[in-house]
A protein has these predicted regions:
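A structural boundary/capping signal
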Residues: 1-207
Length: 207
Protein backbone atom coordinates (compact mmCIF):
# COMPACT_ATOMS: atom_id res chain seq x y z
CA UNK A 1 0.00 0.00 0.00
CA UNK A 2 1.25 3.45 -0.92
CA UNK A 3 0.99 6.31 1.51
CA UNK A 4 -0.85 9.28 0.00
CA UNK A 5 1.02 12.47 0.80
CA UNK A 6 -1.05 15.64 0.70
CA UNK A 7 0.74 18.82 -0.34
CA UNK A 8 -0.91 21.71 1.51
CA UNK A 9 0.07 24.06 -1.32
CA UNK A 10 -1.13 21.81 -4.14
CA UNK A 11 -4.62 23.25 -4.54
CA UNK A 12 -3.31 26.78 -4.17
CA UNK A 13 -0.84 26.11 -6.97
CA UNK A 14 -3.62 24.65 -9.12
CA UNK A 15 -5.84 27.68 -8.54
CA UNK A 16 -3.00 29.99 -9.59
CA UNK A 17 -2.40 28.32 -12.97
CA UNK A 18 -2.76 30.86 -15.78
CA UNK A 19 -2.05 28.97 -19.02
CA UNK A 20 -2.48 25.48 -20.53
CA UNK A 21 1.29 25.11 -20.44
CA UNK A 22 1.30 25.77 -16.70
CA UNK A 23 -1.50 23.24 -16.26
CA UNK A 24 0.54 20.62 -18.08
CA UNK A 25 3.59 21.31 -15.91
CA UNK A 26 1.43 21.13 -12.79
CA UNK A 27 0.11 17.73 -13.82
CA UNK A 28 3.63 16.55 -14.61
CA UNK A 29 4.66 17.48 -11.07
CA UNK A 30 1.64 16.32 -9.10
CA UNK A 31 -0.46 13.77 -11.01
CA UNK A 32 0.69 10.20 -11.61
CA UNK A 33 -1.07 7.56 -13.69
CA UNK A 34 -3.02 5.18 -11.48
CA UNK A 35 -6.07 5.15 -9.25
CA UNK A 36 -6.23 5.72 -5.51
CA UNK A 37 -8.94 4.06 -3.43
CA UNK A 38 -9.06 4.47 0.35
CA UNK A 39 -5.36 5.20 0.53
CA UNK A 40 -4.28 2.32 -1.71
CA UNK A 41 -2.79 3.05 -5.11
CA UNK A 42 -3.30 0.75 -8.09
CA UNK A 43 -0.74 1.34 -10.83
CA UNK A 44 -0.88 0.69 -14.56
CA UNK A 45 0.78 -2.57 -15.52
CA UNK A 46 0.20 -4.24 -12.16
CA UNK A 47 -1.96 -7.37 -11.97
CA UNK A 48 -4.66 -5.76 -9.84
CA UNK A 49 -5.02 -2.51 -11.81
CA UNK A 50 -7.68 -3.53 -14.33
CA UNK A 51 -9.76 -5.38 -11.76
CA UNK A 52 -9.67 -2.36 -9.43
CA UNK A 53 -10.75 -0.09 -12.29
CA UNK A 54 -13.70 -2.31 -13.14
CA UNK A 55 -14.85 -3.13 -9.60
CA UNK A 56 -13.64 -0.46 -7.16
CA UNK A 57 -13.05 2.78 -9.06
CA UNK A 58 -15.43 5.70 -8.60
CA UNK A 59 -15.10 9.04 -10.36
CA UNK A 60 -13.90 11.71 -7.93
CA UNK A 61 -14.18 15.45 -8.26
CA UNK A 62 -11.26 17.11 -9.99
CA UNK A 63 -10.07 18.56 -6.67
CA UNK A 64 -10.18 15.16 -4.95
CA UNK A 65 -8.17 13.68 -7.82
CA UNK A 66 -5.60 16.44 -7.37
CA UNK A 67 -5.48 15.80 -3.62
CA UNK A 68 -4.82 12.09 -4.15
CA UNK A 69 -2.19 12.74 -6.82
CA UNK A 70 -3.35 9.79 -8.92
CA UNK A 71 -5.71 9.34 -11.84
CA UNK A 72 -6.12 7.32 -15.02
CA UNK A 73 -7.18 9.01 -18.25
CA UNK A 74 -10.84 9.27 -17.27
CA UNK A 75 -9.83 11.06 -14.06
CA UNK A 76 -7.17 13.28 -15.57
CA UNK A 77 -9.53 14.48 -18.28
CA UNK A 78 -11.80 15.82 -15.53
CA UNK A 79 -8.96 17.89 -14.06
CA UNK A 80 -8.38 19.30 -17.52
CA UNK A 81 -12.09 19.93 -18.07
CA UNK A 82 -12.31 21.78 -14.75
CA UNK A 83 -9.43 24.11 -15.60
CA UNK A 84 -10.36 24.86 -19.22
CA UNK A 85 -13.99 25.48 -18.28
CA UNK A 86 -13.06 27.86 -15.46
CA UNK A 87 -10.76 29.79 -17.81
CA UNK A 88 -13.38 30.17 -20.54
CA UNK A 89 -11.71 28.12 -23.27
CA UNK A 90 -13.56 26.45 -26.09
CA UNK A 91 -12.85 22.77 -25.52
CA UNK A 92 -14.14 19.25 -26.09
CA UNK A 93 -13.63 16.04 -24.14
CA UNK A 94 -13.42 12.89 -26.25
CA UNK A 95 -13.61 9.14 -25.76
CA UNK A 96 -12.12 6.71 -28.28
CA UNK A 97 -12.85 2.99 -28.23
CA UNK A 98 -12.72 -0.12 -30.41
CA UNK A 99 -16.36 -1.27 -30.26
CA UNK A 100 -15.84 -5.02 -30.13
CA UNK A 101 -18.25 -7.31 -28.29
CA UNK A 102 -17.16 -10.00 -25.86
CA UNK A 103 -13.73 -9.89 -24.20
CA UNK A 104 -12.55 -6.72 -25.91
CA UNK A 105 -8.75 -6.59 -25.38
CA UNK A 106 -8.27 -3.12 -26.90
CA UNK A 107 -7.48 -0.08 -24.76
CA UNK A 108 -9.85 2.90 -24.76
CA UNK A 109 -8.88 6.49 -23.94
CA UNK A 110 -10.28 9.88 -22.97
CA UNK A 111 -8.61 13.21 -23.65
CA UNK A 112 -9.25 16.93 -24.15
CA UNK A 113 -8.75 19.30 -27.06
CA UNK A 114 -9.06 23.07 -26.88
CA UNK A 115 -8.90 26.14 -29.07
CA UNK A 116 -5.84 28.32 -28.45
CA UNK A 117 -6.91 31.87 -27.60
CA UNK A 118 -3.87 33.36 -29.32
CA UNK A 119 -4.16 31.88 -32.81
CA UNK A 120 -7.49 29.96 -32.78
CA UNK A 121 -5.73 26.69 -33.60
CA UNK A 122 -6.81 23.49 -31.92
CA UNK A 123 -4.56 21.73 -29.41
CA UNK A 124 -4.59 18.15 -28.16
CA UNK A 125 -3.77 18.31 -24.45
CA UNK A 126 -2.32 14.98 -23.37
CA UNK A 127 -0.95 13.99 -19.99
CA UNK A 128 -2.31 10.52 -19.22
CA UNK A 129 -0.95 8.85 -22.38
CA UNK A 130 2.76 8.64 -21.55
CA UNK A 131 3.70 7.90 -25.18
CA UNK A 132 2.15 11.15 -26.42
CA UNK A 133 2.50 13.55 -23.51
CA UNK A 134 2.43 17.25 -24.29
CA UNK A 135 0.38 19.91 -26.01
CA UNK A 136 0.09 19.22 -29.74
CA UNK A 137 -1.17 21.99 -32.02
CA UNK A 138 -3.17 21.58 -35.26
CA UNK A 139 -4.89 23.87 -37.72
CA UNK A 140 -8.34 22.38 -37.14
CA UNK A 141 -10.28 20.43 -34.54
CA UNK A 142 -10.64 17.50 -36.95
CA UNK A 143 -6.88 17.31 -37.51
CA UNK A 144 -6.30 17.12 -33.76
CA UNK A 145 -8.81 14.30 -33.28
CA UNK A 146 -7.58 12.30 -36.27
CA UNK A 147 -3.96 12.64 -35.12
CA UNK A 148 -4.88 11.24 -31.73
CA UNK A 149 -6.77 8.42 -33.43
CA UNK A 150 -3.63 7.37 -35.33
CA UNK A 151 -1.58 7.39 -32.12
CA UNK A 152 -4.28 5.34 -30.41
CA UNK A 153 -4.10 2.76 -33.18
CA UNK A 154 -0.30 2.67 -32.88
CA UNK A 155 -0.47 2.12 -29.12
CA UNK A 156 -2.91 -0.77 -29.36
CA UNK A 157 -0.81 -2.27 -32.13
CA UNK A 158 2.24 -2.03 -29.85
CA UNK A 159 0.40 -4.32 -27.42
CA UNK A 160 0.63 -7.03 -30.11
CA UNK A 161 -3.09 -6.82 -30.80
CA UNK A 162 -4.36 -7.47 -34.35
CA UNK A 163 -4.83 -4.25 -36.32
CA UNK A 164 -6.61 -5.11 -39.56
CA UNK A 165 -8.86 -2.76 -41.49
CA UNK A 166 -11.88 -4.52 -40.02
CA UNK A 167 -10.57 -3.87 -36.52
CA UNK A 168 -9.80 -0.21 -37.27
CA UNK A 169 -13.31 0.19 -38.67
CA UNK A 170 -14.71 -0.63 -35.22
CA UNK A 171 -13.23 2.57 -33.75
CA UNK A 172 -15.77 5.05 -32.46
CA UNK A 173 -15.08 8.54 -31.14
CA UNK A 174 -17.53 10.26 -28.83
CA UNK A 175 -17.75 13.85 -27.64
CA UNK A 176 -19.00 13.58 -24.07
CA UNK A 177 -20.01 15.93 -21.29
CA UNK A 178 -19.07 15.89 -17.62
CA UNK A 179 -19.99 12.56 -16.04
CA UNK A 180 -21.60 12.30 -12.61
CA UNK A 181 -19.22 12.33 -9.65
CA UNK A 182 -19.27 8.92 -8.00
CA UNK A 183 -19.88 7.06 -11.26
CA UNK A 184 -18.71 3.47 -11.40
CA UNK A 185 -16.75 2.14 -14.36
CA UNK A 186 -19.96 0.87 -16.00
CA UNK A 187 -21.93 4.03 -15.21
CA UNK A 188 -19.19 6.13 -16.80
CA UNK A 189 -19.40 4.04 -19.98
CA UNK A 190 -23.20 4.04 -19.95
CA UNK A 191 -23.18 7.84 -19.78
CA UNK A 192 -21.08 7.96 -22.93
CA UNK A 193 -22.97 5.33 -24.91
CA UNK A 194 -26.38 6.73 -23.92
CA UNK A 195 -25.74 10.47 -23.94
CA UNK A 196 -22.56 11.35 -25.83
CA UNK A 197 -22.35 12.50 -29.44
CA UNK A 198 -20.83 9.93 -31.79
CA UNK A 199 -18.68 11.99 -34.17
CA UNK A 200 -17.04 9.05 -35.95
CA UNK A 201 -18.85 9.32 -39.30
CA UNK A 202 -18.36 13.07 -39.44
CA UNK A 203 -14.61 12.66 -38.98
CA UNK A 204 -14.29 9.84 -41.52
CA UNK A 205 -15.81 12.06 -44.19
CA UNK A 206 -13.15 14.70 -43.54
CA UNK A 207 -10.16 12.36 -43.27
Amino acid sequence: MHKIELDNNKLEKYNNIKTPEELYEFMESYIKYGIEIDGKVYEWGKDDFQKACEEKWRLKSSLDIIKSGYGHCWDQTEIERDWFKKHNYEYKTLFIIFLIENNNPYVCHTYLIYKDKKDNKWCWFEHADYNNKGIHKFNTMEEAILAQKEKHIEFNKSLNLPMTKDIIDTIHIYEYQSPKIGSTNQEFLDNIFNNAKDITKKLIKKS
